[in-house]
């Protein structure tokens, strides 16, 4: 891809983007009681005004008591938070940009006492946040089904608020990634074991979100090799495993993949980045991010 290509239009689902610049999600901790601050509409609108074609919001907690792991993270539960998100969307749309809401559950990263739901533990597939480190709650099949339903309900809320789509946060060692990762998923039912089974939770969520929203509403997923618990972690040890992973997720027909790399200049395997590898394995649009810095080339571009 040449620099010129970055400024060419691109489509995700039925959304035509004016260029190929995407603002990646960044946690801001500016949402007391889960309500985006009064400055949130201006914050996101500045990026749209600057020319970014697609904005992915900061992580937004799904509407379950166990979803929170950090202070002052926004949610979708109150009328006040919904009102602010609606204003954010309206401001972004003024500049012919699209905006997707990132739906986030931290999983076992949650520590009891982090918020008003003080006795609610961190939810995980197997009670693990790292190999042999069992410090969290192991989800039952009923818990999993409930969580899938909650993601779907929140996706529907996002569409009603005017968002153009949602990104399911499946990266960085949080809940969905804990299902992906063999170190934290040692289940023996349909949600654990093989790599294919470890993607089942994510596939169920993607399909559930699609089932309750319109065909023009985009549903995609973010994933990574690295975890905040282990920067050297791997979902896939080689290209064959990565292809299996991508193929499994593709069965749910997500509208995009968002590959998160700690260092975009460091090859993932075979001298290629994760984004490049995934792009070569699927026709589904691929977003890539990882430590973009303000070097001279970036400033000139």
PLM regions with names:
Residues 1-301:
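Flavin-dependent oxidoreductase catalytic cores
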């Amino acid at each position: 891809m040449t620099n010129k290509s970055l400024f060419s239009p691109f489509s995700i689902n039925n959304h035509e983007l004016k260029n190929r610049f995407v603002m990646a999600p960044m946690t801001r901790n500016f949402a007391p009681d889960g309500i985006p601050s009064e400055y949130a509409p201006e914050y996101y609108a500045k990026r749209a005004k600057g020319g970014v074609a697609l904005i992915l919001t900061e992580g937004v907690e799904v509407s379950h008591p166990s979803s929170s792991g950090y202070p002052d993270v926004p949610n979708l539960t109150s009328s006040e938070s919904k009102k602010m998100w609606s204003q954010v969307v309206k401001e972004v749309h003024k500049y012919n940009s699209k905006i997707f809401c990132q739906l986030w559950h931290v999983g076992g990263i949650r520590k009891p006492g982090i918020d008003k739901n003080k006795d609610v533990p961190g939810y995980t597939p197997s009670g693990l946040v790292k190999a042999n480190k069992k410090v969290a709650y192991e989800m039952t099949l009923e818990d999993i089904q409930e969580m899938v339903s909650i993601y779907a309900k929140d996706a529907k809320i996002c569409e009603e608020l005017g968002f153009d789509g949602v990104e399911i946060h499946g990266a960085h060692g949080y809940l969905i990634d804990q299902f992906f990762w063999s170190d934290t998923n040692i289940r023996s039912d349909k949600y654990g074991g093989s790599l294919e089974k470890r993607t089942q939770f994510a596939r169920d969520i993607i399909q559930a979100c699609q089932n309750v929203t319109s065909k023009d509403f985009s549903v995609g997923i973010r994933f990574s090799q690295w975890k905040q618990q282990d920067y050297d972690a791997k979902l896939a040890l080689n290209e064959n495993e990565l292809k299996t992973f991508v193929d499994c997720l593709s069965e749910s027909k997500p509208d995009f993949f968002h590959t998160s790399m700690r260092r975009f200049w460091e090859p993932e395997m075979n001298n290629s980045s994760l984004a490049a590898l995934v792009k070569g394995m699927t026709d589904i649009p691929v977003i890539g991010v990882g430590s973009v810095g303000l070097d001279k080339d970036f400033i000139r571009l």
